[in-house]
Design a protein with these regions (language model features):
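Catalytic cores of nucleotide-enabled group-transfer and carboxylate-activating enzymes in metabolic
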Residues: 4-5, 31, 39, 71, ...
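Long, low-complexity intrinsically disordered regions
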Residues: 103-131
Length: 475
């Protein structure tokens, strides 16, 4: 941007320091120095003849003004130097007027520029800047309701969404250092390219804060990993959808919940991060119910399913088990149905509690089916203490659960109409209910209640279904 040569001052009436230096600006002008004064609020307050109305803050934005007054020297249309606030020695050096403002205090701090007031900076960036956003703009007539327009265009999951204005999307993009145009991959079923900008748009609609955006991005990256088999998860007639588990320092930084009501409503980060992923699948990939999404019943968890792990336990965390350090933040995606509660309020030692958990796990998919799906077991704090007080590690609990979940082959009839199971080689011996890596233990939940939660999934069978996928959260 080419600037007027000479001196440029940016001021506002609503600033004691700007009022203080107004006579100084007159003094500069009378000394014959080329001077342009941009006034952010009331152009009539300054006595300088060369004042310019900058109430639209266009010049303040383009000049990058953060503090007023600011005095800038311009040579050949380019800024050479600037000073902020009132520092007599700096103003004198910049103007070449040694006695400038001799009767004023030696220095006085400036005030915040109107161009950086909360909510204003983003509006100016959208209006005058280069945001990097390229998504198609949709004009909404003034007489129409933005929220209703989102419903009518099919952008909603059935609940109201936040209309994704340019300003809101730009503000959301400030939550990451990644470029808006970066392509994360192709979202099934339509295999549409998904950019950071498109993720931000859907994060706005979901109700996310900008600081949640890196978590949403990582969740989208995990969902698009071929190992997760998102297309298959969408097309199945089974109940499942994506479930996001968050580990690392970002949990506390953005205020996630891993305690009471952890799988329920009430926490903005948990609710909106999971919802944002579902909206990306719907709005970018075209994964809509009764189209490609062929779930016979679905689950309320397909609105949103996201929570953080309780890392203040003696066990290794999910993230550590999957190769991350404690100081790294990560997401792990599972396919998941709704939770199945497991109550055991009597067991005070590990073995009977293992039998209770195994009894609940036996019901996953069908009590007479083995190795059909994986499951996540969310161990509540009171159940967790039973294991910890006995010195049991996570690995010991997993081994005991697998041992308790060996099913006799003759019990795998799955509701056959035959009076007795038909003998076959498959009925000999026992079968594991879950593959070796098919059980995952998570720590979370409220302090009161001898409960845990079983969360089954969909066909977690490697190449035949979906596998959990973890991604580091990058800011």
């Amino acid at each position: 941007m080419s600037l007027p040569n000479g001196l440029i001052a940016v001021v506002k009436r609503d600033c004691p320091t700007c009022l203080l230096v107004d006579p100084v600006l007159v003094e500069i002008e009378r000394a014959g120095k080329p001077l342009t004064v941009y006034v952010q609020d009331d152009p009539s307050f300054t006595q300088v003849a060369g004042s310019v109305d900058d109430r639209d803050l266009a010049q303040s934005f383009r000049l990058g003004i953060e503090i007023v007054p600011t005095l800038i020297e311009v040579v050949a249309g380019q800024e050479v130097q600037r000073t902020i606030g009132w520092v007599r020695s700096e103003w004198a050096a910049l103007t070449g007027l040694a006695t400038l403002g001799a009767d004023l205090p030696a220095h006085r701090p400036g005030c915040g520029s109107k161009s950086v007031e909360p909510g204003i900076a983003e509006q100016l960036a959208v209006r005058y800047g280069h945001t990097g956003m390229t998504a198609r703009r949709v004009s909404v007539p003034p007489q129409e309701d933005d929220i209703e327009v989102c419903f009518e265009r099919g952008w909603s999951d059935g609940l109201p969404v936040v209309p994704p204005s340019e300003t809101r999307v730009y503000r959301m993009l400030q939550g990451t250092s990644r470029a808006p145009g970066e392509v994360l991959g192709l979202v099934p079923p339509n295999l549409s390219p998904c950019t950071i900008e498109k993720v931000a748009i859907n994060a706005v609609m979901a109700g996310c804060k900008p600081e949640y955006l890196p978590v949403v991005i990582a969740a989208v990256e995990a969902a698009l990993d071929p190992a997760f088999c998102l297309h298959g998860l969408l097309a199945t007639t089974w109940f499942s959808g994506p479930m996001i588990i968050v580990n690392g320092p970002i949990r506390e930084r953005i205020g996630m919940n891993w305690q009471g009501n952890v799988l329920g409503q009430g926490n903005r980060a948990n609710a909106t991060i999971g919802r944002a992923l579902q909206l990306v699948v719907r709005n970018v990939g075209g994964g809509r119910p009764r189209e490609i999404d062929q779930a016979a019943f679905g689950t309320p968890a397909k609105f949103t399913f996201c929570f953080a792990e309780d890392e203040a336990t003696a066990w290794t965390t999910l993230a550590e088990d999957r190769g991350f350090r404690r100081d790294q933040s990560s997401v792990t995606l599972f396919s998941a149905d709704g939770p199945l509660g497991c109550a055991d309020q009597k067991s005070r030692t590990p073995q009977p509690l293992i039998r209770s958990l195994a009894g609940s796990l036996r019901a996953v998919t069908h009590v007479e089916m083995a190795n059909a799906a994986d499951a996540v077991v969310v161990i509540g704090p009171e159940h967790g203490r039973v294991f910890e007080q006995a010195g049991w590690s996570k690995a010991q609990v997993l081994a005991a659960l697998h041992a308790a979940l060996q099913i006799r082959g003759q019990d795998l009839g799955m509701g056959t109409d035959a009076a007795a199971p038909v003998a076959s080689p498959n009925t000999a011996g026992t079968r594991p209910k879950f593959r070796p890596e098919g059980l995952t233990l998570i720590r979370a939940g409220g302090q009161a209640g001898l409960f845990s939660a079983i969360i089954p999934g969909w066909l977690m069978k490697g190449s035949l279904g979906t596998d959990p996928v973890s991604k580091e959260i990058l800011i």
